[in-house]
Swiss-Prot record:
The gene is rnpA. One of its GO terms (biological process) is tRNA 5'-leader removal. It comes from Mycobacterium leprae (strain TN). This is Ribonuclease P protein component. Belongs to the RnpA family. One of its GO terms (cellular component) is ribonuclease P complex.
Length: 120
């Protein structure tokens, strides 16, 4: 579970991250990473999830969200204080194992962070 200080809540944060952030596409998830201008390490990074109804029923969507939150929590150490991450689950994410979803999320986040470092 993500702590309250790490959760993205405002739609403006989601919009900015998706619009201005770098995107890494995996087969079951899309990761948007926006490295903020204010590189304040005392702040906590924010993570948000987008799980559309196309993923499945409410039970399936919540299961996917729980899996993604669990993996995202373990990767907070790789993020800077001003970083914002949006994870969009694709419909195929409901059919894959937790380990496969975790691997895709780690690979996608690593790819997006590498892109952000070269652009920064």
């Amino acid at each position: 579970m993500l702590s309250a200080c790490n959760r993205m809540r405002r739609s403006s944060e989601f919009d900015a991250t998706v619009k201005f952030g770098l995107r890494a596409v995996q087969s079951d998830v899309i990761i948007h990473v926006w490295r903020g201008c204010n590189r304040d390490e005392t702040k906590a990074p924010h993570v948000g999830l987008i799980i559309a109804k196309t993923v499945g029923s409410a039970v399936e969507r919540h299961r996917v969200a729980r899996r993604l939150r669990h993996v995202a929590r373990t990767m907070l150490g790789e993020l800077g204080g001003a970083d914002q991450v949006v994870i969009r689950a694709l419909p195929s994410s409901r059919n894959v194992s937790s380990a496969w979803l975790a691997q895709q999320l780690r690979n996608g986040l690593r790819c997006a962070l590498d892109l952000a470092e070269t652009d920064w």
